[in-house]
């Protein structure tokens, strides 16, 4: 029995669980390849980096639809260049080997993505549709997020033991939001990959290292400072408690504290100034504005003590993060993190930093789940410490054994809820992208001028109908219109129940509308995801008559 337990302990490592997490990220990319309105800017900007030269800025999407607040192009520029390089490499690999050619042309393997891929001839390349580029783009971002999370778990394993690292990895795997959003081009995810890496630097020095511990502290401060300057200014709420902790609680005397304050403040200011200058230089050109710093614009837009224009997009109660957002995002890790804070001294600083972030963010009336991504690894670390404590106590009493079993049952239930409810609902929440793909499947006929004119309404544009979903080779034939003037358009994808006389519905696209309890015997699954027609594909009846 002991040999079996040791063998099992050796085989189950956080590396293995992190591998499953990465595979889950890729699975979500495959079954939900589209992006929504929150990801719109980075998605469209990355598309334009790939398909338009820098001297063609007037053709870029942000020129026509600038959005509410300017965002930085630094992320899309890097991601777009990496996507082009990887796409070219995949073309070489796939087309140089007959086995890989057959694999990547197999519709059974591609499943739900097959309608995005035209039948490929032997001489044609693999990366043919724009949607392929979007999938590759998301794979790259998913790799970056997974690597940072793996680094964080590796540091936990090194300093707190393999069991704690496995628990942290298992909790991340059981949560829906981390894996589903890890590959999505949100500014929050660009920031998440960097802040998680910074937190691993901060956590790594809890045990003696050959390198000076203050160096890792300073590096962590520098990475978060870069995030503040470029991607998410709200991470100042993470930078502040992190800086206070490394300055006040990791010093030996007043002299050491003074040196650390000077070093960390200088590093923070230097990085913020350097990357703010970089952002201003690049973004001012792309936005065609003088001295534009996007994150300063975002800060001015969201500042609760200033104009705070974000409240026009909806507000929630002060405690909403605590009673709604965190329970949904963390699931079983939410109570376990509190248990870990109470019973495990080593994780208390992490819990306090994460709690300060959530508490400070609660003062902003406009609240969203994605705002909390930077501190999810910290809460999971605290929850993993709590599970480890339960594991140590399980043989000491019946109560300890019961709580340990209850915790693992919670992990299993969390997995079931994540996949059976959250994932199923979210996958069905991109009717705009599905409608655009369905339109291309119909092989629309050209009009007298040799064009196909499609109008995309706001709802479809916000639920997946991005530039990546548009035709690759027929981009001069199909004219996509997202403006209000649509009297010359023959095709429409929209959520309207009725259209003017002369239009015909040719395809209905279903989407997520809600969840409900299953009241029919045998009551399985207990929670049902409801779908209904969300978007319709219309075309003029004249076209139908001409084709007949």
Regions found by a protein language model. Give the residues of each.
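Start-transfer (signal-anchor) and selected internal transmembrane alpha helices
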Residues: 1-28, 134, 263-274
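Signature aromatic-anchored transmembrane alpha helix within multi-pass, membrane-resident enzymes
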Residues: 15-21, 272, 347-355, 381, ...
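Extracytosolic helix-loop segments that constitute the early lumenal/periplasmic catalytic or substrate-binding loops
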Residues: 23-26, 41-70, 74, 81-93, ...
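Membrane-interface alpha helices of multi-pass inner-membrane proteins
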Residues: 25-29, 168-170, 174-182, 196, ...
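Short acidic/glycine- and proline-prone juxtamembrane loop motifs at membrane-interface regions
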Residues: 35-37, 180-190, 369
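Transmembrane-helix motifs of polytopic, lipid-linked glycan transferases
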Residues: 102-107, 111-112, 135-163
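Transmembrane-lumen/periplasm boundary regions of multi-pass, lipid-linked membrane glycan transferases
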Residues: 188, 224-367, 420-425
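Catalytic lumenal/periplasmic loop and adjoining terminal transmembrane helix
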Residues: 284, 397-547
């Amino acid at each position: 029995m002991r040999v079996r337990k040791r063998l099992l302990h050796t085989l189950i490592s956080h590396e293995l669980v992190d591998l499953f997490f990465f595979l889950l990220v890729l699975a979500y990319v495959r079954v939900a390849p589209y992006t929504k309105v929150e990801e719109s800017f980075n998605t469209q900007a990355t598309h334009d980096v790939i398909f338009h030269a820098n001297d063609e800025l007037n053709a870029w999407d942000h020129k026509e639809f600038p959005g509410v607040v300017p965002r930085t192009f630094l992320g899309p520029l890097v991601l777009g260049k990496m996507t082009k390089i990887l796409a070219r490499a995949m073309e070489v690999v796939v087309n140089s080997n007959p086995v890989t050619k057959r694999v990547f042309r197999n519709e059974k393997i591609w499943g739900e993505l097959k309608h995005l891929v035209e039948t490929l001839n032997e001489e044609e390349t693999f990366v043919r549709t724009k949607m392929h580029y979007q999938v590759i783009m998301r794979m790259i971002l998913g790799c970056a997020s997974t690597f940072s999370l793996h680094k964080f778990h590796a540091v936990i394993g090194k300093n707190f033991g393999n069991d704690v690292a496995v628990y942290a990895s298992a909790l991340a795997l059981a949560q829906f939001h981390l894996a589903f959003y890890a590959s999505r081009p949100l500014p929050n995810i660009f920031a998440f990959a960097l802040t998680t890496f910074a937190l691993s630097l901060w956590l790594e020095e809890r045990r003696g290292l050959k390198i000076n511990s203050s160096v890792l502290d300073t590096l962590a401060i520098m990475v978060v400072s870069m995030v503040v300057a470029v991607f998410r200014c709200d991470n100042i709420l993470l930078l502040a408690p992190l800086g206070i902790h490394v300055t006040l609680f990791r010093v030996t005397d007043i002299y050491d504290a003074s040196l650390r304050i000077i070093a960390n403040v200088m590093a923070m200011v230097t990085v913020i100034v350097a990357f703010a200058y970089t952002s201003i230089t690049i973004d001012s050109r792309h936005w065609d504005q003088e001295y534009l710093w996007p994150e300063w614009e975002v800060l001015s837009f969201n500042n609760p003590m200033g104009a705070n224009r974000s409240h026009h997009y909806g507000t929630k109660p002060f405690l909403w993060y605590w009673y709604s957002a965190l329970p949904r995002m963390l699931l079983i890790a939410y109570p376990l993190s509190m248990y870990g804070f109470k019973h495990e001294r080593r994780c208390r600083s992490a819990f306090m930093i994460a709690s300060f972030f959530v508490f400070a963010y609660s003062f902003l009336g406009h609240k969203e789940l994605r705002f909390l991504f930077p501190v999810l690894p910290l809460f999971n670390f605290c929850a993993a410490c709590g599970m480890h404590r339960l594991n140590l106590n399980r043989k000491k009493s019946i109560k300890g054994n019961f709580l340990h079993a209850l915790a693992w049952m919670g992990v299993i239930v969390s997995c079931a809820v994540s996949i059976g409810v959250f994932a199923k609902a979210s996958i069905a929440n991109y009717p705009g992208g599905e409608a655009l793909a369905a339109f291309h499947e119909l092989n629309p006929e050209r009009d007298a001028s040799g064009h196909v004119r499609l109008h995309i309404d706001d709802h479809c544009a916000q639920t997946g109908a991005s530039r990546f979903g548009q035709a690759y080779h027929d981009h001069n034939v199909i004219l996509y219109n997202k403006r209000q003037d649509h009297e010359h358009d023959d095709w429409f994808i929209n959520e309207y129940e009725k259209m003017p006389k002369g239009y015909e519905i040719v395809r209905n696209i279903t989407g997520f509308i809600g969840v409900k309890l299953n009241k029919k015997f045998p009551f399985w699954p207990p929670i049902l995801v409801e779908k209904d027609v969300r978007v319709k594909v219309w075309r003029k009846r004249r076209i139908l008559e001409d084709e007949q």
